[in-house]
Curated annotation (Swiss-Prot):
Residues 89-102 have a biased composition (Basic and acidic residues). Residues 28-42 have a biased composition (Low complexity). This is Transcription factor CRF1. InterPro entries: TF_CRF1/IFH1. It comes from Saccharomyces cerevisiae (strain ATCC 204508 / S288c). Transcription factor, corepressor with FHL1 of ribosomal protein genes. May be involved in the blocking of the spread of silencing. Pfam families: CRF1. GO terms for biological process: negative regulation of ribosomal protein gene transcription by RNA polymerase II; regulation of transcription by RNA polymerase II.
Length: 467
């Protein structure tokens, strides 16, 4: 931001930037402190300077001194290498206007450039943005560069203008953050004393994935100084851990982080998963969780096969009762089969008169064969004979009813049955007494039984209608 002064003051600088990238818009302040006067400069990216003068030099007393103190950097440090960076300022002051021009001799300019180039080559083959200022204030005043900006946000410089002509001051050796053309958002820090750089990767935001890549400490020269057993890939539990981590330690040249955040290696994830799977397999292989058919004994020779169902049902009930408790009482009750008791000598459809199966006979019905034709096989057609009707009222032979052959016994005779077959019985008794029993005639009579009954029923119905 340009600040207008009541006096006419113009300061120009010569831009010197090897890297063509434009950094973020920042201001550069330079203060000249001496026993008599103090000058503070503020610069922008467009190359122009804004001068804040002390009231003893000019009448610009309305500028606040708080703005100057807020832009100061750390004070001058001791025990540093002495660098010769001297600039000559010529100052011309008139009564009506103050005009400042920047001038620097060709010999002194080349010497300053050589000093900066030597410092950069000693630090390593890295991209460096120099912020040299060539300022001419006149009046034979000298300004010495005190320090470099410590970060991208703090890009202000402090200059000292003593009352003497030229003095040599210690330059503060601080790592400078430099933007590097890379596919990730990273920053290279150059340390002039240690002659090696440290790659620092900026953390991602909290909206990113939970597991982010931690800081990879890899010196630019390939050595392993200051880091013990670095891991190529490390994961952290939360991306917010970077907020509490300390920044680069510029004095030691390595990155220090707090110990209360634990890191987990990628390989440990696989080991953890393997242990979890092993625990699950051990639990499933336990005797309480397995259900096999080893406890079920199958014997095909036994008559009662309910033992198979009973044993499996008992195992199932024991497993369910031990695991779930009293909630499965109704579930187990569904499988309980109640014995059926019959009353009043009731019987089932099972034929109890059949003989028990012989255990010695392996194949049942191995002699059975299909009857295709009676003439071909040699089986005679069954004949009709007189059957005793003591146990059953009638019998079925070849699909024909034999109840009309002989009269029923006295204990089961009914008037309805007698009336229905009286005519047929009388005719057959006469035939039986007159001649011998004829099979062909009997078969013919049996085949015509249904037709005679239908004719009799129809004739009786017609007679009733005629009456």
């Amino acid at each position: 931001m340009l600040l207008s002064a009541p006096v006419n003051s113009t300061v120009r600088r010569k831009p010197h930037s090897p890297n063509k990238k434009k950094p973020k818009e920042t201001g550069t302040a330079a203060s000249f402190s001496s026993s008599s006067s103090t000058v503070v400069l503020s610069s922008n990216n467009d190359g122009s300077f804004d001068a804040l003068w002390d009231p003893s030099i000019s009448k610009a007393s309305d500028f606040e001194s708080s703005y100057i103190s807020a832009k100061r950097l750390k004070p001058e440090s001791s025990n540093r290498q002495k660098k010769k960076n001297s600039y000559k300022y010529s100052r011309e002051e008139n009564t009506n206007e103050v005009e400042e021009k920047t001038s620097l001799g060709s010999s002194s300019k080349t010497e300053a450039d050589n000093i900066f180039n030597d410092q950069l080559t000693s630090a390593g083959n890295t991209t460096y943005v120099s912020n040299k200022r060539d300022v001419n204030f006149g009046a034979n005043s000298a300004v010495v560069l005190l320090g470099l900006p410590t970060s991208k946000s703090e890009s202000h410089r402090q200059y000292h203008s003593p009352s003497a002509s030229t003095t040599n001051e210690d330059e503060e050796d601080i790592g400078v953050d430099i933007l590097v053309d890379n596919h990730i958002d990273s920053c290279e820090t150059v340390s002039i004393n240690n002659n090696r750089g440290i790659t620092h990767q900026y953390p991602e935001t909290e909206s990113d994935v939970d597991f982010d890549e931690a800081v990879i400490l890899t010196p630019m020269d390939g050595t392993d100084k200051g880091v013990k057993n670095p891991r190529p890939l490390e994961k952290k539990y939360s991306s917010s851990c970077f907020e509490d981590r300390t920044p680069l330690n510029l004095d030691d040249g390595h990155f220090s982080e707090c110990n209360h955040f634990s890191t987990l290696d990628v390989s440990s994830f696989f080991h953890l998963n393997e242990h979890v799977h092993k625990i699950d397999e051990v639990e499933l292989d336990g005797p309480d969780r397995t259900f096999s058919l080893d406890n079920v004994a199958i014997n095909t020779r036994k008559k009662d096969i309910d033992c198979l169902y009973n044993s499996s049902r008992e195992d199932l009930s024991n497993l369910t009762c031990s695991s779930e408790g009293p909630r499965n009482d109704s579930y187990d009750s569904d499988y309980n089969i109640d014995e059926v008791t019959y009353r009043d000598d009731e019987s089932t459809d099972e034929d109890e008169s059949l003989p028990t199966p012989d255990r010695k006979r392996k194949k049942i019905g191995h002699k059975a064969c299909e009857i295709l034709d009676s003439k071909r096989i040699g089986i005679k057609v069954p004949k009709l004979y007189v059957w005793s009707l003591s146990d059953k009222p009638f019998s079925v032979i070849d699909g024909l009813c034999t109840k009309s052959l002989y009269p029923l016994s006295d204990d089961i005779n009914t008037p309805e049955s007698l009336s229905s077959c009286s005519s047929s019985v009388s005719s057959r008794e006469n035939q039986k007494g007159d001649a011998t029993f004829d099979n062909d005639a009997m078969i013919a009579d049996l085949l015509n039984i249904g037709g005679l009954e239908v004719e009799k029923a129809s004739n009786g119905h017609i007679e009733l209608i005629g009456e």
